[in-house]
Structures are given as C-alpha cells and as structure tokens.
A protein has these predicted regions:
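Transmembrane alpha-helices of multi-pass inner-membrane enzymes
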Residues: 65-66, 362, 387-440
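A membrane-periplasm/extracellular boundary helix in multi-pass inner-membrane enzymes
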Residues: 215, 236-282, 297-305, 313
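Transmembrane signal-anchor hairpin modules in multi-pass inner-membrane enzymes, especially those
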Residues: 1-98, 121, 131-134, 141, ...
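Long extracytoplasmic/lumenal interhelical loops at the membrane interface
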Residues: 283-294, 305, 309-351
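Hydrophobic transmembrane alpha-helices and their immediate junctions
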Residues: 351-393
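Alpha-helical transmembrane segments of multi-pass inner-membrane proteins
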Residues: 45-47, 134-162, 170-237, 260, ...
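Hydrophobic core segments of transmembrane alpha-helices in multi-pass, intramembrane catalytic enzymes
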Residues: 57-68, 112-124, 173-190, 206, ...
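Transmembrane alpha-helical segments and their membrane-water interfaces
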Residues: 68-78, 97-150, 175-188
Length: 440
C-alpha cells in the first residue's frame, strides 16, 4: 500500500502538466520579484538622485513610470478603488482641469501646465504601487538617502566651494524646504519603527538634513521644524503619557532655543524680526521681508478684484505695475519681485477662489485621509502614514513663504510620496489577495 502511494505521488509530481504548472508558477513569482525589486530600488534612489544628480530624480521616475506601464499592461488582477482613492483622483483631476481652463481663458503659455501635469503623469506609478508587495525599507531608506545627500551637497557647496547659501541643484529656498522635510520624515520613521539600529540611522538623517537646511539659510523652511515637532507630539506614535509629552514639549522648546544660539540662524532670525517690525511700524517695505509682505498685499488686492477666476498665469508683473502706478503698493515691487512667495496667495491671484480651493485640497485631503487611517492602523502602514502626515505639514509650512508647486523638484517629491503612501497604506486590506493572484 505504501509502495503504491509512493508511486502515485511520484507520478503526480512528474506529470508533464504538473511540471509545466510548477515552472510557470516559479517564472511568474520570479518576474513579480524582479519587477517589485526594481521598483523598490528606483524608489530608494529617487530622493538622493533628485537632490544631487542633474535630472536624476526625473530619470528615476521615468524608469518607474515605464516599469509601471509594463506591469499594468500585463496584470489581470482587479483591485477596486476605495472612497479615499476616488477622492484623491478627483482632486488631482480638478486641480489639472482648473490649470487647463486658466490656460485657455487667459491664453497663457503652455508651460503653466508643467507641474500640474506631473500629478497626472505619475498616476500609472500609483496604480502600479497599489498592487505591489513593496517593502517598507525601500521607502524609509530612500528618505534616509535623500537626507544624507542633502547634507553632503550642502556641506560641499558651503565649505568647499564657499557659496553664500547652499542650494543643491536648485534655488536655496526649495532646497532648504526639501531638506527640512526629509529630516522630519526621518524623525517620524525613527519614532515609529522598532529596530534600534534603524532608529539611530534615522535620527542621524534628521540631524544631517537639518544641518543642510541651516546651510541653505532658508528662513521659511525653518518654520517647518517646530511645526513638525509639535505634529509628532500630537501624533504620539510611542503612546507617551501626558507627563512624557510635556517633557517632550520642553525638550522641543530647548532645541529651538539652542538653535537660536547658532550665529547663522540668529542673524537670519534677527533680520526677519527687524524687517517685519519696520514694515508694520514705519511702513518700510524696502527690505527683503518688507517686499514679500508688500507682495502678499498686492496678491490680496488682485484677488479681491478678480475673486472667481483670478488674473491668469503670466499676468502678475503687469498687475504689480498697475498697482504701483496707482500708489497702492511700493513701486519697487514692479521691478524686483518675480512671484508671490506664497503658494496659497499665488493660487488666489492667478486662479481665483477655485484655484485656491483646489490647491488647499491637494494638501488637506491627503492629510485628513492619512490622519484618519493613522488612528486605526499599525505596523508598516502606521509608519508610512506618519511619514505622510509629516510630509504634508512640512510642505504646507514651506508653501507659506514660497510658490511650492512652481518648483519642479518639490512638485515631483510631493506627488511621488503622496502616491506612494496612498498606494501602500490607504488601499483596502484585500489588496494582498489581489496582489497574490495577479498574473502576467
């Protein structure tokens, strides 16, 4: 009986159809592993390449886009969109549609669609990511690599080349903003993972990225540090007691106070305070901060006169000139300011109330989704959601003093990580079944 059973089992294993099925299954798993691993490597490399290699981030995303299109074309699995994802896609579509309508209405240059189109172009990457078994380490180590890259290039530029402000491969303002954002994302990972060695690396990434931002002398980006630290205290990832959170608040206050003793920071902060005081007490707009505040005033005036649709992209300079000629703003603005230095005011004056709402929703909708999911998730998803919340809070803060979505690198970075976190942490739990059943 045992001999017969052994013969039957042997024949079953060696049956041609069974062998073919096993080989096909192995090849399928190998293909899936290769595609997912390649995608993970590209996601890992993306932040560092974005910061230190000309067009490096764009090339990494282009390869990821091509990989996504290949997998989506071969995949037969279905993973229905949930309400969170539908709302995200709706907001992205509305944002682009408003940009397109603004282009048509005011006959603006086609280049105004540049950054808005990136949200649409990266959608295949999102649909690909939501079906993968991508490991958390590719995302977290990628953030760390970006933070280290910021420090390396900032130190090289400041101390070896002797440039006044570290800027990476872009303007110092977006560079400083991305640096502090990467640093805060490292900190959020450090506080939500369990690995002791991982925590040390992530804390190091936080410090290095903060140094890079300091070397950029970008004051608006520095505001993200206290906002990020307070956000982390409110998220309470380690479930600290009230006493522990009070102690954490005091430590945060101490860190910020000690930061002020750094001469470079002290000089920039003191200059900011003096500029603001001069603007409001002496009506002196002939300073760096004074001109920015006067620009905000011009944007509010322009919006009040065109509240629904705005003035259109490319018409800001002519509006400044008209306001200066009527003595409603400082005449110096007409020749010295290129943009509004505030993403939300920029959306208001260029695209009106509709543009402002769509811009706000690009930040606030993912923020609300991530926070709602964060309260009920655990493990890797909770780590990713904490990263997403910090990303958005830091981005909102830097957007208060700069035209956030006018910068290619910031737009690519924000869109990529929003899609990554949605795809990995906000899809339905049934995604695991769909991913296992996917075939090519």
């Amino acid at each position: 009986m045992q001999v017969e059973l052994k013969i039957i089992m042997t024949n079953k294993i060696l049956h041609p159809e069974t062998v073919f099925s096993n080989v096909a299954s192995f090849i399928h798993r190998l293909k899936t592993f290769q595609i997912d691993t390649t995608a993970g490597v590209l996601i890992f490399l993306f932040p560092a390449l974005l910061m230190v290699v000309p067009d490096g981030g764009a090339i990494a995303l282009l390869l990821l886009l091509l990989l996504s299109l290949v997998k989506l074309a071969r995949s037969k699995s279905q993973l229905p969109l949930n309400s969170n994802e539908i709302w995200l896609l709706a907001i992205v579509s509305i944002y682009f549609t408003i940009e397109l309508f603004n282009l048509w209405l005011f006959e603006s240059d086609i280049s105004v669609l540049d950054n808005a189109s990136r949200f649409l172009l990266l959608l295949p990457v999102y649909f690909f990511i939501r079906k993968t078994n991508l490991s958390l380490k590719y995302v977290t180590l990628g953030i760390l690599s970006g933070a280290i890259a910021c420090f390396v290039i900032a130190s090289y530029q400041k101390f070896y080349l002797g440039v006044p402000r570290a800027h990476g491969l872009q303007n110092p303002v977006p560079f400083g903003g991305l640096s502090i954002t990467l640093g805060l994302m490292c900190l959020s990972v450090a506080l939500t993972i369990e690995s002791r060695q991982g925590k040390i690396w992530m804390y190091s990434g936080f410090l290095l990225a903060c140094i890079a931002s300091i070397l950029s002398e970008t004051r608006g980006a520095w505001l993200a540090l206290p906002i990020g630290l307070v956000t982390i205290l409110l998220l309470n990832p380690k479930r600290w007691s009230i006493k522990a959170r009070i102690a954490g608040s005091l430590v945060t206050l101490l860190i910020l106070t000690l930061s002020y003793t750094i001469p470079l920071i002290q000089h920039r902060v003191d200059a900011t305070i003096l500029n603001v005081a001069a603007y409001f007490t002496e009506a002196n707009a002939n300073t760096s901060i004074g001109l920015r505040l006067e620009t905000w005033k011009a944007a509010i005036i322009g919006f009040s006169e065109n509240p629904m649709l705005g003035i259109g992209e490319g018409n800001f300079q002519s509006t400044l000139k008209q306001l200066a000629e009527s003595d409603r703003i400082n005449p110096l603005l007409a020749t010295s300011i290129a943009h509004v230095h505030n993403e939300f005011l920029s959306a208001m004056i260029h695209k009106g109330g509709l543009g402002l709402i769509s811009t706000l929703l690009l930040f606030l909708l993912p923020l609300a989704t991530f926070y709602r999911q964060y309260k009920s998730q655990h493990g890797e998803r909770k780590v990713l959601l904490a990263v997403g919340i910090i990303l958005i809070m830091s981005s909102i803060t830097t957007a208060l003093s700069d035209v956030f979505f006018d910068h290619h690198k910031q737009t690519l970075f924000y869109a990529t990580y929003i899609y990554l976190i949605y795809g990995l942490a906000c899809t339905d739990i049934q995604k695991n079944t769909a991913k296992q059943n996917s075939s090519y």
